[in-house]
Amino acid sequence: MPGKLKVKIVAGRHLPVMDRASDLTDAFVEVKFGNTTFKTDVYLKSLNPQWNSEWFKFEVDDEDLQDEPLQITVLDHDTYSANDAIGKVYIDIDPLLYSEAATVISGWFPIYDTIHGIRGEINVVVKVDLFNDLNRFRQSSCGVKFFCTTSIPKCYRAVIIHGFVEELVVNEDPEYQWIDRIRTPRASNEARQRLISLMSGELQRKIGLKVLEMRGNAVVGYLQCFDLEGESGLVVRAIGTACTLDKLSSPAAFLPACNSPSKEMKEIPFNEDPNPNTHSSGPSTPLKNQTYSFSPSKSYSRQSSSSDTDLSLTPKTGMGSGSAGKEGGPFKALLRQQTQSALEQREFPFFTLTAFPPGFLVHVGGVVSARSVKLLDRIHNPDEPETRDAWWAEIRQEIKSHAKALGCHAVVGYSESTSICEEVCILSASGTAAVLNPRFLQDGTVEGCLEQRLEENLPTRCGFCHIPYDELNMPFPAHLTYCYNCRKQKVPDVLFTTIDLPTDATVIGKGCLIQARLCRLKKKAQAEANATAISNLLPFMEYEVHTQLMNKLKLKGMNALFGLRIQITVGENMLMGLASATGVYLAALPTPGGIQIAGKTPNDGSYEQHISHMQKKINDTIAKNKELYEINPPEISEEIIGSPIPEPRQRSRLLRSQSESSDEVTELDLSHGKKDAFVLEIDDTDAMEDVHSLLTDVPPPSGFYSCNTEIMPGINNWTSEIQMFTSVRVIRLSSLNLTNQALNKNFNDLCENLLKSLYFKLRSMIPCCLCHVNFTVSLPEDELIQVTVTAVAITFDKNQALQTTKTPVEKSLQRASTDNEELLQFPLELCSDSLPSHPFPPAKAMTVEKASPVGDGNFRNRSAPPCANSTVGVVKMTPLSFIPGAKITKYLGIINMFFIRETTSLREEGGVSGFLHAFIAEVFAMVRAHVAALGGNAVVSYIMKQCVFMENPNKNQAQCLINVSGDAVVFVRESDLEVVSSQQPTTNCQSSCTEGEVTT
């Protein structure tokens, strides 16, 4: 399918002064695609040139259209010397290759230089004419849509979810080539940016080909990562979920339905909710969009390390308890048989989605993870990346076997990551083992009778909590009780999962962000000795991280974790672990037991007194947390709950039929179940430190909530005021007498102070919630710790939420809190005195932008195809897959950009803070410009996947690499939809257009 690419250079503005004599510039432009280059005329002596060039035409194959970026270089003409480069613009042509997407790219693009940053803007118009080619041997995948969002896009319907797609490409890193010794830093950076752009395009094309082979037309949950392996080379890899999507053409699908989510669900068969509940986790106003996304399920297990499958806390094969009482064994057997046959033909039945349609997940079995330590070697042949492929195949095979051991045949919420230091690389993968409904995996399933069939066979609202394994064949003891909701099937006492909370899950109270942080020193070593030391440390780190999560979850009085993300980072002399998740109280699970401290030194009065004092503090903290998060579950008589799991010696006396019975209740053993306390033994100073660390987490100030999932459980009435922010903080440690305890304290202080500074800066938005909080920790150099956090602050109407969420069960849970105006409850200590040396303050910037009413008015006609003359106000940016108070009407394509910034005058640019802030602000500006040129007005599912910072203070130098991605979309405010809608306007929708962005 060859095509014709047409480019027109219109004008430039705000160019830098390149001729010191005249304080002006003689600018011209080179337009390059592939091996063909065109040049404009030189526009003499102007900082705002008007080229108005002719149309430059490139006749190329569609394979090149997908692989190659359009390069636009702005230069200053010199008569007697080499032309000076002003900057470059890379434009991805891929969004123009979709039949439903934009037909033209037109707008002002920032001219970017890797040394000086943004240096003016250039107005470019790009068009593509494609010729249809049905050649079955073609190497392009034009028309396959890519989405970063990990749920089904809002204005689409999933026909089939095909499954996992992955690919990786390798090459030599230009930064480590011999020619790099003789070329300028600018030339080296630009060679690197161009190569990464080429590899990214090639990767998308290859994944698109795999999707076409599976007869799909889209990739959802697309995650692309760069592995900078130094001298070993450069690896670009990606994973995603292949789907067949249908565009929802019905205008009714986009109408607002503020307080009636069920109205929208009935318009879309995939989202039929057969069992509405007044206190579901999905908010009403923003999540009118969310009804298009898949409702996830939950699971519980410890992460199983690559060497120890038995760490998984969700047991093995067998049918075990079903998902609903009316579903008997025959249906479950048939369901499992169908699903297994549907998934057997797939090598890896993985899904990168974190949200699913109701009924897609039948059961979940637990968090499964695998890690592997590898030694990097040089990539000899870039065309044959078998080594890296084999590494990841091993990891995926292990994940698959872990899931099978848990009685599950699929893994959802799947993700992969790496951590590289010198020659050592840690490969990590994690997901949630699950049993899936085969109807969504086969063709012809989404027809008219789907709603009726779903109502017949769907599990109840608590079905995802029920165990998918046979309780009589568990490889380890676990506490199971009868479900507190249906009281017919067994549930574990705790659930861990890597996916989002289902919109139909019944939760009590609100959720909160729970983090486990851990540092471990290691000796400096080389090659195999280093890899061995890391391998020996990993299992213990995972165990300690898991223990921290369990303790903090119980301290909060909650019983489930969602969105669990564990990151292990390797440095030259230390390993760091950071786990983030959102804790909630699920109504279907038993009330968590308390935490009991047991000492090992009897007959010591002062010690016993200290232990009792600590025990009292823990009990008080649990009580305060239950009040803070409004956790007050209704009392259920223990006779209803059922019996605990028998000991192994008793199991042989029980018949299998008894495990299927939901009516027989044996005598209750009060030593099990919800009466059981979690015992912490204090036998050394490390154990005491662990207990102290439990009590050092300061709760957020009044009016603030935080979570790492898209939506805060228990909060329903969001307003349309949002602020996205990115914060980077770097500290340098002193190597003198550094111990594990001191390292842990410094790391804890760093993360806590980062959160405190965010609460302080966002205090004017109270009451608000920090959603999608994403922490990333890296060790760029010896004794240097860098923490990057991105999140979005969303305000909510607290009074309205109190009125709308009250139910007969929950009236006792609601408190009429009147402390909204109260600010901080903690002393603000942004620079901890305990740090051995000065921490760098965060790269600060307050770029608060307000969308004018005029700009918002332009959104009214956004349902029409974007044209060259269309104007876009402020381009919104959010890590969420939706925009509160708005409807997404069109997806314009994926934004995937990689930038390098280098400076040789670090101190003059404001130090690390000024340098990082300026670079991040420039990245935002370039992302916004590309989205606006496509005719979009927002970026959703935005993520900063990499932020690699390196500095050399002695030479006053620094370098930073940033990789960002997201989905460019067109959205319409619900207030605008009400004007054009023929239906009755809905109420209780706030449509304030104030939105900003805080970059710290």
From Swiss-Prot:
Kindly list the positions annotated as binding Ca(2+) 1.
D19, D26, D76, D78
Needed co-factor(s):
Ca(2+)
Chain residues that bind Ca(2+) 2: D19, D76, D78, D84
**Where do the C2 domain residues begin and end?**
1-109
Know the name of this protein? C2 domain-containing protein 5
Which keywords, in A-to-Z order, does the entry hold? Calcium, Cell membrane, Cell projection, Cytoplasm, Cytoplasmic vesicle, Lipid-binding, Membrane, Metal-binding, Phosphoprotein, Protein transport, Transport
Q: What is the effect of changing D76A?
A: Reduces calcium-binding, phospholipid membrane-binding and insulin-stimulated SLC2A4/GLUT4 translocation
Offer one example of a GO biological process linked to this entry: positive regulation of protein targeting to membrane
Q: Using the UniProt annotation, give all residue ranges assigned to the region (Disordered).
A: 265-330, 639-669
InterPro entries in UniProt = C2_C2CD5, C2_dom, C2_domain_sf, C2CD5, C2CD5_YbjQ-like_dom, C2CD5_YbjQ-rel_dom
Q: Where is the composition biased (Polar residues)?
A: 274-289
One example GO MF annotation: calcium ion binding
Q: How is the cofactor bound?
A: Binds 3 Ca(2+) ions per C2 domain.
Q: What is known of its domains?
A: The C2 domain binds to calcium and membrane lipids.
User: Pfam families per the record?
Assistant: C2, YbjQ_2, YbjQ_3
According to its UniProt record, where is this protein located? Cytoplasmic vesicle membrane; Cytoplasm, Cell cortex; Cell membrane; Cell projection, Ruffle
Q: Which GO CC terms are listed, alphabetically?
A: cell cortex; centriolar satellite; cytoplasmic vesicle membrane; cytosol; plasma membrane; ruffle membrane
The chain residues annotated with the modification Phosphothreonine are T317, T601, T666, T807
Q: Where is the composition biased (Low complexity)?
A: 290-318
Q: What does this protein do?
A: Required for insulin-stimulated glucose transport and glucose transporter SLC2A4/GLUT4 translocation from intracellular glucose storage vesicle (GSV) to the plasma membrane (PM) in adipocytes. Binds phospholipid membranes in a calcium-dependent manner and is necessary for the optimal membrane fusion between SLC2A4/GLUT4 GSV and the PM.
Q: Where is the composition biased (Gly residues)?
A: 319-328
